[in-house]
Every structure is written in C-alpha cells, then in structure tokens.
Amino acid sequence: EFTALSLLFSLLLLTASAEQCGKQAGGARCAAGLCCSNFGWCGNTNDYCGPGKCQSQCPSGPSPKPPTPGPGPSGGDIGSVISNSMFDQMLKHRNDNACQGKNNFYSYNAFINAARSFGGFGTTGDTTARKREIAAFFAQTSHETTGGWPTAPDGPYAWGYCFLREQGSPGDYCTPSGQWPCAPGRKYFGRGPIQISHNYNYGPCGRAIGVDLLNNPDLVATDPVISFKSAIWFWMTPQSPKPSCHDVIIGRWQPSAADRAANRLPGFGVITNIINGGLECGRGSDSRVQDRIGFYRRYCGI
C-alpha cells in the first residue's frame, strides 16, 4: 500500500509562494552564503550566481561549484513498487470512451519501459520512500491529464491520464531561442503525462532521451514510451532555478532559512510549486492545488 505515512510526510505545503529572496520576497536574504537569483531563488550554481543572473549576495569571483550529492540508497525494480493491477486501479478510467488515451495509450508496460531508463526513479530509498515518489508522480501527472469532474463515476480522482494533448486552443508556445529553435509549423503546447510545453523544454528533453522533439513534438502524444519518458525526464531534471521533483520527494533537497520562513518544506507542495507555482502557489486556497492533493490522497490509500 501507499501508506498514510507517505501522505503525512509530504502534505507539508499547500500555499507556498513562488520566490525565496530579493525583491520578489520582500528583500529576504539567502542563508548559508547562497546567491539570490534574478528570479528570487537561492542557490550556488551559475544560474543563481553568474554574471547577469544574480540580484543579491553575488560572489566577487567565479560562481561556487555545487556539492556532488552521494547516491541515495536504492533497491529493486520499479515493477516491485507498482504492479500492473495497482496501475490499473489508480488510473481506473484512463481508457474511458471520452478519453483521448482510450485505446490503452497510457499502458503499464510503456510506463515500466520508460521508467527503467531513469536510474533512481521510484527506486531510491526504502520501500516507503519509493512508494511515496510513485504516488506523488502519478498524482501530479493525473491532475495534468484529468478528465474527471466532481460527480464522476468512482469520484474525480479516478480519472487521471485521460488526455494526451492540452485542451482548448493552445498557441504554439514558441519562445525565440538560439539553442532550441522552433521548427517551422511545429507547436509546443502541452502533451503527455506532465503536459510538457514550450520549445525550451521539448528541446532538452528530446536530447536527453535521444529523440528530436523540436521537429517531432507530437511524438509525445503518439508514442507511449516517449510520452512517459517526457514526464519522467521533467520529474528527474532540476527546473532551474528550482530543484527537481525527484530530489524534493526523496529528501535530497534541503530548504534554506528563507524556504522555511515561507513554509517551503520538503514534500508534495514544493513539487506543485516546481511544476506550476507561478500560477497556483501563494494565492491562498486554489482548486488546482486541491485537485493535485486529492489525487495524492487517493493514491496513498491504494
């Protein structure tokens, strides 16, 4: 089971603000000699301390190098953490006729295949820690792809992984970039479990998984393994200047004094901040935040 302990450990942040320091946080300073980036986050890499990227507590010399984290304890295959039957129970209505993925696009085998490409995902720490990460991952991605509604059969939190593509009439999500140039006629709206969007995410994601997603972004909505890989890549990769979702949920990320003062503590809420904090956090009660928590509660109880 995904235990109640996992839930109590992780539901620590419901209304976090999106910044830690500087003008975005009322002049707050970073602890432990960390730099305050132009975006209001504390850290010690070039994204925080580099020329033109640091607003306060900036170094006079080269940016300090971050410490190299030691490998966390791990064990077992991802299949030992989440079984096929558990996967089906969690994503109970993903193949409903009203869902884009109704022909078993989001399959258990595709998930396992993709997950095994990312060392440490769902396999770091003890059994409770591994289950906590899987519950958090599926809760966040279920919110992004939900087809549920308040009176839906089996409740709104049984309808994750319904959609493949962003709903409505999304734009092209193209930001001019020399490193990740947009391909003619291609659009980089949300696709897949995490609804990856923007060329500056499709580009590095594709490079990491060995696929040209700048020229072929719709592979995220047509190839099940690539679709899952895009979500796990986002989960495992630091979203500068924020940490990775993975590092937060396994306890590797340590909050600064400013984080603690703003109630940004290790847990599920910080992950919401990483994924969509600019729109959902620091605004009091938000139905989207509550939806993410609702999925997490359900999965922790399975």
Curated annotation (Swiss-Prot):
GO terms for biological process: cell wall macromolecule catabolic process; chitin catabolic process; defense response; polysaccharide catabolic process. Residues 19-60 form the Chitin-binding type-1 domain. Induction: In response to infection, elicitor, ethylene, wounding. SUPFAM superfamilies: Lysozyme-like, Plant lectins/antimicrobial peptides. Residues 61-72 have a biased composition (Pro residues). Residues 1-18 form the signal peptide. Disulfide bonds join C21-C36, C30-C42, C35-C49, C54-C58, C162-C182. Its EC number is 3.2.1.14. It comes from the Eukaryota. It catalyses: Random endo-hydrolysis of N-acetyl-beta-D-glucosaminide (1->4)-beta-linkages in chitin and chitodextrins. It is found in: Vacuole. The keyword Disulfide bond applies. The active site is at E144. Gene3D superfamilies: 1.10.530.10, Endochitinase, domain 2 (3.30.20.10), Endochitinase-like (3.30.60.10). The keyword Glycoprotein does not apply. Residues 59-79 are annotated as: Disordered. Belongs to the glycosyl hydrolase 19 family. Chitinase class I subfamily. This is Endochitinase 4. It comes from Solanum tuberosum. The lineage of its organism: Eukaryota, Viridiplantae, Streptophyta, Embryophyta, Tracheophyta. The gene is CHTB4.
